[in-house]
From Swiss-Prot:
Pfam families: DUF2057 (PF09829). Belongs to the UPF0319 family. Keywords: Signal. The gene is yccT. This is UPF0319 protein YccT. GO terms for cellular component: outer membrane-bounded periplasmic space.
Amino acid sequence: MKTGIVTTLIALCLPVSVFATTLRLSTDVDLLVLDGKKVSSSLLRGADSIELDNGPHQLVFRVEKTIHLSNSEERLYISPPLVVSFNTQLINQVNFRLPRLENEREANHFDAAPRLELLDGDATPIPVKLDILAITSTAKTIDYEVEVERYNKSAKRASLPQFATMMADDSTLLSGVSELDAIPPQSQVLTEQRLKYWFKLADPQTRNTFLQWAEKQPSS
């Protein structure tokens, strides 16, 4: 089963897609959702970048950084989930630039008024719309796809309506049973299709690292 999935991933991803923009990931940014789709943390773990096509994009993320306390101790600061929308038309690289976050005062200020910049490959600021994603769910585990869909339907500052319904039934990820020898449960199909989607976005080094990791996993 494991070898079959890895082989399928390679076969599906060999055709070269035309990507125009490299999103450079920051170690202080925990990416949660990209363009309405939950980010595959297992595939992007340790990745330096992912590839985007030209056009509008939306990121949902948290800033996570160790800050210094007044008593010389440290703690991990985790920001509220943030939404940023931007357009990569004619842009070949996107880089995060966060404000200084070193202590409790700066963290509290960021919570109250988040700010950041996205820079292109020439360090020129990219126009962005930034907002806090207010979570409505009281569940212990938050479904960020559902929260982002609700946000995008609410005409908020960083909303992008085109991503509001993309994940309603995952129809954009399910490619049809003709690719499969047998019809597995839909949850299995969806998991594999999500994996294929993020595999295609990952840079070559990350793909190779993931495949090496997958080969070492025990067969189910």
